[in-house]
Amino acid sequence: MNLSQDGIKLHRGNFTAIGRQIQPYLEEGKCFRMVLKPWREKRSLSQNALSHMWYSEISEYLISRGKTFATPAWVKDALKHTYLGYETKDLVDVVTGDITTIQSLRHTSDLDTGEMYVFLCKVEAWAMNIGCHLTIPQSCEFQLLRDKQEA
């Protein structure tokens, strides 16, 4: 059985089949940690596209106000630094075997749709606070989730 790093979507229809796939691991006598949490889909392509549109809009806004360094890539990193933070990784030097622990910005691709919605809300609030009004297409997933929240 090849378990995805993202986990398995468990539901009534596949419970028995998953149990059969896990059983051989248990017969080896090893113990495992199982975390059960509600399933949420990974952040969507619509959310990703909106975030990149916003990085460009914020970049244009900042550059027009003299912040010439504020490229879309810089904006993306700055917002991830502020609102997502960092993850720790151990990297192994393949020649020496030395392990170096580094910190790298979290990736939006690791967020679920709810976490990405929260990130986008924080970005939008910050942008509004500096006077930058971001475009929100009426039919985009962000707007649909917002409408659902406010219903």
Swiss-Prot record:
GO function terms (MF aspect): bubble DNA binding; single-stranded DNA binding
InterPro entries: NinB_sf
Disulfide bond annotation, renumbered to this chain: none
Other notes: Encoded by the cryptic lambdoid prophage DLP12.
NCBIfam families referenced in this protein's UniProt entry, alphabetically: PRK09741.1
Family: To equivalent protein in phage 82.
Name of protein: Uncharacterized protein YbcN
Organism of derivation: Escherichia coli (strain K12)
Higher taxonomy: Bacteria, Pseudomonadati, Pseudomonadota, Gammaproteobacteria, Enterobacterales
